[in-house]
């Protein structure tokens, strides 16, 4: 008799009669035709699959918020319930569910788990409507689904129980009285539901009342009834549960037990069947007691009896789950019994014998483990996450079963429901093998867009005590190492985010001109595969140390070359924008062909902060990368004495630590200079380098003209005296740093000749710029006068404000006693590569405004790199024709400051003052006259205070007094009395701020450039290793249909193609479509220009401790403060509710509530600003 064949007018009467007779055992029920699942998500789909296998029509219900959920689509039919109701409430509308079932001729309803699955009133409503409830009868549910009633039944059946309240309680006072009688710890549990909802352990009497309120609220929200019961807490138990099946003929069997001891907040995380290492005697008694209890109450259908087993083997009944369990899967895997099919067929009236299920035939084979993959962030206390799944790839293969619902790319994880995404079940011959399969499967998962607990699950599975099966419910609490995660790299998706950002919003690195990077592939000279670099000068340094290294340099015939192409050349010509990507590409050729170089300058100066600020790459990683590719040539960097890589003075311990780390990472030669030639600053840098084991190249910044007798400040005597002090300070190499290129050939001959005569044993190294056009001639004179090393840039990166041409110097010295030993053929190939590569940096090309050098540098003495910047600024402001005036004013500013040494940061001081004078139409005389009333640039004030150091000939007066107006002065070395930085404390603070383990190098970058580092770190976490992208794509992105291969590491290459860019949606976003490794992916990018019109909720700013945001998406359930309130640190501010979990958010600081941005009831996204506290 099928219900569907009965005319609708009589259907309800027949159904009621049928069900009553069925319940009383009078008639044998017939087969179902249509079965509804009153649930959602993966359990609904699990039941649908069973119905399909049994050739039955599956029917889904769904809430409005679940309109796009997969369970609605998987069913044969689906109907909306709870229209206009909150998301969870829709699945609790018994009347609407029954009405829908009657309307569509539903024969039976399967409740799944959660929601109404343990509500006896729902089972009764089904019965009254003539619909079969697939589960226990209403009276059994009322008794067993109610945990207190189930406890009483256990006592009646002779099963030992844990001390607890005799019935549900609804007031905190009752909980307090129980705690007083039995002592703490106690546990509060929801009386009408499970899944960890409404459960709290309480260790102190004074905490009972607040815990009761929270548990009651959670239970009310999850199950529609906040009643709780209280039990004495059993210490260190294992959580063992027994799976039961009972028919309507009085037969009952067990399907053995499961171990659910791995729990968090009383919610199961990992389940195992059968329970490993459970003593056989205990197992048999537990199974027998579970059957005894089930027979005592006349249990029907599927259910679970749960026990706590203590360390001595004593066990206590805790509850019955009168429904199917989430972890039923592991029992199915070890017994081969389809529990859901069995449920349905038992509800149809079949006996266990009909199903060929008897205790004797039910056996276990092997072991099974289930892991619940959830959208929770274990690094943040398992905060639920929600949002769009951008990427989903599962782990599969032999021994792996996946039960899921919303696990696919494009799926939106709602904040309204449970965070379970997919259940992964691994089965094998034994527990360790099952764990190995599970580890393999979880490692293959790729889920992007939402956080998951997979890293935590992997740590659990690898933990020795888990593998030894010696875990109890304290397992997670007692193993903090489970929360030590290796951050997910997520490189591919982050790079897509970057390319999408560039496509929608344009370059992330500001482009200096309208020129576009050329579409070129720079030619890389051929190198035989596996060829090892020949021996170079670095081998001497590594084997014999800095002192012997210096002797070796001095003893070698000829003049050696330092190649500045990797640093100062592009700093001068291309705004310091050359990326590691392009340096690394040519590095193997450099190692093979230029082993005769003295050094390769590739680090320091402006490159350090620019690499983070504009190129979004780590300067330390650049050093590490190049060191691996060029092991044979010494690396050279520019060290600003007490400024290190920065622009201000740092405490000494920062300088020393920086040098230590630089040497550790592969730096060899440190050109130590000071922007004022201030000896105390120089000595700090020299001592730090020497202590670290680096080569100390003490540099004297050159200015003026030693051949001009009228310029008596920086004469030959000045340089010889300073050089004498540096040599006495144990410099390994003496350097002349001509940063403006004002060292004329004749001056070079005089100065270098005098230094060589006075210091015959120390190597001399000369650096210059070719701004005047006389750089090659000057370097040739240096070589002839006794210089051991001169600086040059490869031909296509030389000239103008860069260094002189390497090819020109090498060719000019060939065949002489100063021969460099370098090959012009190799230089030609090297130059061809950089000529092509330079076109990629067209947006930063100085040649757009600068067409040649200019000998007027001998007057204004502007350093090479600064000259380029000043000229570009002038042209960009429409002052190109007045650039000569800008240069003239630079000279005036220098003179008014006392004719100082000009190199970063002192050159910036002169530049700032020059612009200030131009803007205010000042001359040298009027500046001094009006100084009392002018607001000078900060850099000028700092200089006058002595914060940069002491000029060789003192500060200009009365200008200094007028500028300072009583401000304090520093008379000695600025950093001498600076408090050491607690680098360990900084590391802890940074790791807390950025949420990952940071290196010593990261801490050092922050110590010198705190804001730049923070922004770089935030950028990299969002967009990944953009340094792996080819330069043109990094700067301007992909064109539609363009493809690119991106090697993210050796043997791992991403194939990326940009497919399309979507239209603007109502959230101000555009969807950008990519093909990644043959699979389509899409991301949503906020159109920053269009979104200016869209009102959004303010965001909590990272690093601002008074900004307290929503740590997860959810609703503001309760505000515990109001504006103007004084709050203490860790005082509760508000309660957030998400995924049926409540979280109390505390204040991280003491202060006053400045503003509440999200009133009670507000729906928040993760990171939305809720409360603002003013310290």
Curated annotation (Swiss-Prot):
Instruction: Determine if Signal is one of this entry's keywords.
Output: no
Q: Which residues form the Pyruvate carboxyltransferase domain?
A: 559-828
Q: Which organism is it from?
A: Caenorhabditis elegans
The record's function comment reads:
Pyruvate carboxylase catalyzes a 2-step reaction, involving the ATP-dependent carboxylation of the covalently attached biotin in the first step and the transfer of the carboxyl group to pyruvate in the second.
GO CC terms, sorted: mitochondrion
User: What coarse category fits the chief subcellular location reported for this protein?
Assistant: cytoplasm
N6-biotinyllysine-modified residues are 1140
Name of the featured protein:
Pyruvate carboxylase 1
> Which cofactors is this protein said to need?
biotin; Zn(2+)
Residues that, per the record, bind ATP: 147, 231, 266
């Amino acid at each position: 008799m099928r219900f569907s064949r009965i005319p609708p007018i009589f259907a309800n009467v027949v159904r009621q009669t049928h069900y009553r007779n069925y319940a009383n055992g009078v008639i044998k029920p017939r087969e179902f035709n249509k079965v509804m699942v009153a649930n959602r998500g993966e359990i609904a789909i699990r039941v649908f699959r069973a119905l399909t296998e049994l050739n039955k029509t599956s029917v889904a219900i769904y809430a409005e918020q679940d309109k796009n959920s997969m369970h609605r689509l998987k069913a044969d039919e689906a109907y909306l319930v709870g229209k206009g109701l909150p998301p969870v409430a829709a699945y609790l509308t018994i009347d609407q569910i029954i009405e829908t079932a009657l309307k569509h001729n539903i024969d039976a309803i399967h409740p799944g788990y959660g929601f109404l699955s343990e509500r006896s009133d729902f089972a009764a409503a089904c019965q009254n409507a003539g619909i079969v409830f697939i589960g226990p009868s209403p009276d059994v549910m009322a008794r067993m689904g109610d945990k207190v009633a189930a406890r009483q039944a256990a006592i009646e059946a002779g099963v030992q129980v844990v001390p607890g309240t005799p019935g549900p309680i609804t007031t905190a006072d009752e909980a307090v009285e129980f705690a007083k009688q039995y002592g703490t710890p106690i546990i509060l549990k929801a009386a009408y539901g499970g899944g960890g909802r409404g459960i709290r352990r309480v260790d102190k009497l004074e905490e009972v009342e607040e815990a009761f309120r929270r548990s009651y609220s959670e239970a009310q929200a999850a199950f529609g009834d906040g009643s709780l019961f209280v039990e004495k807490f059993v210490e260190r138990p294992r959580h063992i549960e027994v799976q039961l099946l009972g028919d309507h003929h009085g037969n009952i069997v067990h399907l053995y037990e499961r171990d659910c001891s791995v729990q968090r907040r009383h919610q199961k995380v990992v389940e195992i069947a059968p329970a490993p290492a459970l003593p056989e005697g205990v197992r048999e008694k537990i199974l027998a007691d579970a059957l005894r209890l089930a027979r005592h109450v006349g249990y029907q259908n599927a259910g679970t009896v749960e026990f706590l087993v203590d360390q001595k083997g004593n066990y206590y009944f805790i509850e019955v789950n009168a429904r199917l369990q989430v972890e039923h899967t592991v029992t199915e895997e070890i017994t081969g019994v389809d529990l859901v099919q069995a449920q349905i067929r038992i509800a149809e009236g079949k006996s266990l014998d009909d199903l060929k299920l008897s205790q004797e035939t039910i056996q276990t084979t092997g072991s099974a483990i289930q892991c619940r993959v959830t959208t929770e962030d274990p690094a943040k206390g398992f905060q639920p996450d929600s949002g769009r799944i951008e990427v989903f790839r599962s782990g599969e293969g032999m021994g792996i079963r996946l039960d899921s619902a919303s696990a696919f790319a494009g799926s939106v994880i709602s904040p309204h429901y449970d965070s379970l995404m997919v259940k992964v079940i691994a089965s094998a011959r034994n527990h360790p093998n099952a764990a190995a399969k599970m580890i393999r499967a979880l490692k293959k998962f790729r889920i992007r867009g939402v956080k998951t607990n997979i890293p935590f699950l992997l740590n659990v599975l690898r933990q020795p005590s888990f593998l030894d099966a010696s875990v109890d419910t304290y397992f997670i609490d007692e193993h903090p190492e489970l929360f030590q995660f290796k951050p997910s790299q997520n490189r591919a998706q982050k790079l897509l985010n970057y390319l999408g950002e560039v496509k929608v919003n344009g370059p992330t690195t500001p482009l200096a001109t309208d020129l576009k990077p050329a579409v070129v592939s720079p030619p890389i000279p051929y190198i035989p595969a596996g060829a090892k670099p020949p021996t170079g000068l670095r081998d001497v340094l590594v084997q014999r140390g800095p002192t012997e290294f210096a002797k070796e340099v001095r003893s070698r015939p000829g003049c050696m070359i330092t190649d500045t192409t990797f640093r100062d050349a592009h700093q001068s010509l291309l705004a310091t924008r050359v990326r590691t990507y392009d340096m690394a590409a040519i590095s193997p050729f450099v190692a093979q062909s230029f082993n005769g170089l003295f050094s390769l300058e590739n680090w320091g100066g402006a490159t350090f902060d620019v690499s983070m600020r504009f190129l979004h790459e780590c300067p330390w990683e650049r050093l590490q990368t190049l060191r691996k590719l060029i092991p044979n040539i010494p690396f050279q960097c520019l060290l600003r004495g007490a400024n290190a890589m920065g622009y201000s003075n740092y405490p000494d311990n920062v300088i020393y630590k920086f040098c230590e780390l630089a040497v550790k990472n592969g730096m060899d030669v440190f050109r130590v200079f000071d922007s004022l030639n201030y000896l105390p600053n120089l000595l700090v840098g020299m001592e730090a380098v020497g202590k670290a084991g680096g080569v100390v190249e003490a540099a004297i910044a050159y200015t003026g003209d030693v051949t001009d007798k009228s310029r008596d400040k920086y004469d030959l005597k000045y340089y010889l005296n300073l050089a004498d002090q540096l040599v006495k300070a144990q410099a390994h190499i003496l350097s002349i740093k001509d940063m403006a290129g004002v060292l004329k050939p004749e001056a070079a001959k005089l100065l270098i000749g005098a230094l060589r005569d006075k210091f015959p044993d120390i190597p001399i190294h000369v650096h210059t710029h070719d701004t005047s056009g006389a750089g090659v001639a000057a370097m040739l004179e240096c070589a002839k006068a006794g210089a051991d090393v001169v600086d040059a840039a490869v031909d296509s990166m030389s000239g103008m404000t860069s260094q002189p041409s390497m090819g020109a110097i090498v060719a000019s010295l060939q065949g002489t006693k100063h021969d460099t030993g370098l090959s012009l053929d190799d230089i030609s190939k090297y130059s061809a590569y950089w000529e092509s590569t330079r076109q990629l940096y067209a947006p930063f090309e100085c040649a757009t405004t600068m067409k040649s050098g200019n000998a007027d540098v001998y007057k204004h003495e502007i350093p090479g790199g600064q000259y380029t910047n000043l000229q570009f600024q002038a042209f960009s402001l429409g002052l190109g024709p007045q650039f000569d005036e800008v240069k003239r004013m630079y000279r005036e500013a220098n003179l008014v400051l006392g004719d100082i040494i000009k190199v970063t940061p002192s050159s910036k001081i002169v530049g700032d003052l020059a612009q200030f004078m131009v803007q205010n139409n000042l001359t040298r005389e009027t500046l001094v006259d009006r100084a009392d009333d002018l607001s000078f640039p900060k850099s000028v004030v700092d200089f006058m205070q002595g914060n940069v150091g002491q000029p060789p000939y003192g500060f200009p007066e009365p200008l200094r007094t007028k500028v300072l107006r009583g401000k304090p002065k520093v008379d000695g070395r600025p950093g001498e009395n600076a408090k050491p930085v607690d680098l360990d404390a900084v590391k802890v603070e940074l790791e807390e701020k950025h949420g990952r383990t940071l290196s010593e190098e990261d801490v050092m970058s922050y110590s010198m450039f705190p804001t730049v580092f923070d922004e770089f770190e935030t950028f990299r976490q969002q967009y990944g290793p953009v340094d792996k992208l080819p330069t043109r794509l990094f700067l301007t992105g992909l064109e539609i249909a363009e493809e690119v291969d991106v090697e993210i590491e050796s043997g791992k290459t991403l194939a990326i193609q940009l497919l399309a860019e979507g239209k603007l949606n109502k959230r101000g976003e555009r969807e950008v479509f990519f093909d990644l490794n043959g699979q389509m992916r899409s991301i949503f990018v906020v159109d920053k220009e269009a979104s200016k019109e869209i009102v959004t909720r303010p965001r909590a700013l990272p690093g601002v401790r008074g900004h307290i945001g929503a740590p997860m998406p959810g609703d503001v359930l309760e505000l515990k403060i109001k504006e103007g309130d004084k709050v203490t640190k860790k005082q509760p501010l508000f309660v957030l509710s998400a995924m049926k979990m409540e979280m109390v958010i505390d204040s991280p600081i003491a202060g006053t509530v400045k503003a509440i941005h999200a009133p009670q009831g507000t729906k928040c996204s993760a990171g939305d600003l809720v409360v603002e506290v003013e310290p």
